[in-house]
Regions:
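Short, solvent-exposed amphipathic alpha-helical segments in soluble enzyme
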Residues: 98-100, 176-177, 239-244, 271-274, ...
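C-terminal functional extensions of proteins
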Residues: 257-317
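Active-site/ligand-binding-proximal alpha/beta "capping" segment
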Residues: 208-257, 307
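Glycine-rich phosphate/pyrophosphate-binding loop at beta-loop-alpha junctions
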Residues: 176-179, 186-201, 245-249, 253-279
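Phosphate/pyrophosphate-binding betaalpha-module
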Residues: 158-227, 238, 263
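Universal eukaryotic N-terminal targeting presequences
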Residues: 1-27
C-alpha cells in the first residue's frame, strides 16, 4: 500500500510534471509578485471623513467633554468665576459709532423697515453702556484679587466667559487689563465667527454642541456674575440655578445679577415665590448689584465662604 501511495509522487518527479496543488502555489506566488500593493488604510481615529460623519457624533461629543478638562488641568485652572451677559452690549465709543451708522442708513431710505428697526433696537440698548463698564471693572478687580491670593499661596480664581462680544468681551478685557488670564468657552454660530480678542489664547475653546459648552461653564464654576441679556443669558442663568436647586451642583454659589432694575423687571422673582413655584431660599440666593464694588464685595464674600464648607473641599464628581 505504501508503494502504491508513493508511486504517483515518484512518477511526477520522474516525468517532471507538477501536481495541481503545486501549480496553484506557483501561480499565486507569481501573481503576488506582479500586483502592486495599494495604499495603507487610514486608521479610523485619523479619518476626517469619519470623524465628521453622522456615525461619529458620539465621538465628537466625547471630545468636547474631555478636551477642555485636559487643557484646563494643564494650565492649573480649577476655580472659575463665570460672567454671562448680552453679546449686543458695546462700550460707549463703539455704541455711539454704531448709532451714527444706523442713523445714516435709516435716513438714506426711510422706507427701509429693516434699517429703521435696527436703529430702534440700538437706541433701546443705550442702558447697557454703563453696565459694560461695571462688568469690565468687576472682572479686573476680581482678577487682581485672585492674583494677590495666588501670590500668598491661597486658592485662585479665573474669569470665564462665553468668549463672544458684548458683556463677555468686557469681562475678558477686564481680566487682561489686570494682567491675568481668562477663559473663553466659545460656540460656533453663524453670526459670530471668532472669539473676542481678550480671551487668553491657550484658554480659548470653540464648542459645536451647546450642552457640552454649558457643562464646562458650570462644572468649575465657583461664582456667577450675570449682566443683562436675552434668551441665551437667561438660559445660562437658569441652567446654573436649577443645578443648584436640584443638588446637581452641591455648593451654594454666589449669584450676582448686575442691574437690579433690569432683572427685577425682566423676571418677576417675587411672583414666583408668591405662587409657590420657587421657595424664599431660591429667591434669596440671588444678589442684585449696580456697581462694581457692590458686586465685588458680594462675590468675594460668597466664594471665600465656599472655601470653608466641606462640599467645596471635595473633589467634584
Amino acid at each position: 500500500a505504501a508503494a502504491m501511495l508513493a508511486a504517483p509522487s515518484q512518477a511526477s518527479q520522474a516525468t517532471g510534471t507538477k501536481r495541481p496543488c503545486e501549480e496553484m502555489s506557483t501561480s499565486a506566488g507569481s501573481d503576488a509578485a506582479e500586483v502592486e500593493l495599494g495604499p495603507k488604510p487610514e486608521k479610523a481615529y485619523k479619518s476626517s471623513d469619519f470623524l465628521n460623519s453622522k456615525g461619529a457624533r458620539m465621538i465628537r461629543m466625547m471630545c468636547e467633554l474631555q478636551q477642555p478638562g485636559t487643557v484646563l488641568e494643564e494650565h492649573g485652572v480649577d476655580n472659575v468665576i463665570m460672567f454671562f451677559g448680552s453679546a449686543r452690549a458695546k462700550p460707549r465709543a463703539q455704541y455711539e459709532q454704531a448709532v451714527r451708522d444706523a442713523e445714516a442708513k435709516a435716513a438714506a431710505d426711510p422706507s427701509d423697515t429693516r434699517a429703521q428697526g435696527a436703529l430702534a433696537r440700538l437706541q433701546k440698548q443705550a442702558f447697557l453702556i454703563p453696565m459694560f463698564d461695571v462688568v469690565q471693572e468687576l472682572a479686573k478687580m476680581t482678577t487682581e484679587w485672585s492674583m494677590r491670593r495666588a501670590a500668598q499661596g491661597k486658592v485662585a480664581y479665573s474669569v470665564g466667559t462665553g468668549g463672544g462680544p458684548g458683556m463677555m468681551e468686557a469681562a475678558n478685557k477686564g481680566a487682561m487689563l489686570a494682567g491675568g488670564k481668562s477663559i473663553g468657552f466659545g460656540i460656533s454660530l453663524p453670526f459670530e465667527d471668532h472669539l473676542n480678542p481678550y480671551v487668553t489664547p491657550d484658554l480659548a475653546f470653540e464648542f459645536h454642541y451647546f450642552f457640552t459648552r454649558k457643562f464646562w461653564m458650570s462644572y468649575k464654576c465657583m461664582g456667577l456674575v450675570v449682566a443683562p441679556g436675552g434668551l441665551g443669558t437667561c438660559d445660562e442663568l437658569f441652567e446654573v440655578i436649577t443645578l443648584m436647586q436640584t443638588g446637581k451642583i452641591r455648593r451654594s454659589l454666589p449669584v450676582i445679577l448686575i442691574g437690579k432694575q433690569f432683572w427685577k423687571s425682566a423676571i418677576n422673582w417675587d411672583f414666583f415665590v408668591q405662587t409657590g413655584m420657587i421657595s424664599d431660599e431660591d429667591a434669596n440666593q440671588l444678589i442684585f448689584a449696580d456697581t462694581a464694588q457692590e458686586a465685588f464685595d458680594a462675590l468675594v464674600a460668597g466664594v471665600t465662604a465656599l472655601e470653608c464648607t466641606p462640599v467645596a473641599s471635595k473633589k467634584k464628581a
